[in-house]
């Protein structure tokens, strides 16, 4: 077998997986894991890599986003019915680990205003960072709905060592 897979072959395989899923109507959401082997890549020398990719469609429509913002962003979030918290509500959590963990569990992602993002570790402690949900930056000149859609359509990837082949 060749070391490279053509784009057409990959697309055909993905289409086949999706059509197989439609034939077997299941009452739960299935996840598909794509595993790729990298040739001539030394994980010892070239450290592991990770990042995010924005997809054309939203893979998780029930993905919940909360805006942590100043007054202007809170008003904007209220107008478009997005859950939001201002600095006073965050201070009420008072670095309580259980409450911060509960907040991190309640939402899948967070957006924070420029003025607030530097204060979040001081106000909430390391709870959001430990949960892997540190907020993305939300600026005043960017549209909030577009930013929420962007966060919903992003997926994270990371390279892990393969245990067995």
Swiss-Prot record:
It comes from the Eukaryota. The keyword Ribosomal protein applies. Keywords: Acetylation, Cytoplasm, Isopeptide bond, Phosphoprotein, Ribonucleoprotein, Ribosomal protein, Ubl conjugation. GO terms for cellular component: cytosolic large ribosomal subunit. The modification N-acetylserine is found at residue 2. The modification Phosphotyrosine is found at residue 11. GO terms for molecular function: RNA binding. There is a cross-link at residue 118 (Glycyl lysine isopeptide (Lys-Gly) (interchain with G-Cter in SUMO1)). It is found in: Cytoplasm. SUPFAM superfamilies: Ribosomal protein L1. The modification N6-acetyllysine is found at residues 91, 106, 118. Belongs to the universal ribosomal protein uL1 family. Component of the large ribosomal subunit. The ribosome is a large ribonucleoprotein complex responsible for the synthesis of proteins in the cell. Component of the large ribosomal subunit. PANTHER family: RIBOSOMAL PROTEIN L7AE FAMILY MEMBER. This is Large ribosomal subunit protein uL1. It comes from Sus scrofa (Pig). The gene is RPL10A.
């Amino acid at each position: 077998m060749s070391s490279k897979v053509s784009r057409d072959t990959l697309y055909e395989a993905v289409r086949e997986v999706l059509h197989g899923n439609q034939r077997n109507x299941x009452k739960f959401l299935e996840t598909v894991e794509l595993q790729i082997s990298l040739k001539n890549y030394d994980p010892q020398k070239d450290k592991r890599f990770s990042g995010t990719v924005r997809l054309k469609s939203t893979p998780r429509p029930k993905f919940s986003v909360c805006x942590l913002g100043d007054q202007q962003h809170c008003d904007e979030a209220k107008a478009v019915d997005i859950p939001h918290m201002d600095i006073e509500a965050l201070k009420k959590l008072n670095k309580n680990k259980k409450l911060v963990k509960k907040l991190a569990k309640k939402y899948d992602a967070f957006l924070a205003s420029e003025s607030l993002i530097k204060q979040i570790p001081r106000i909430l402690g390391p709870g959001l960072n430990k949960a892997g949900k540190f907020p993305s930056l939300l600026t005043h000149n960017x549209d909030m709905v577009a930013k929420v859609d962007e966060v919903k359509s992003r997926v994270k990837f990371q390279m892990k060592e393969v245990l067995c082949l």
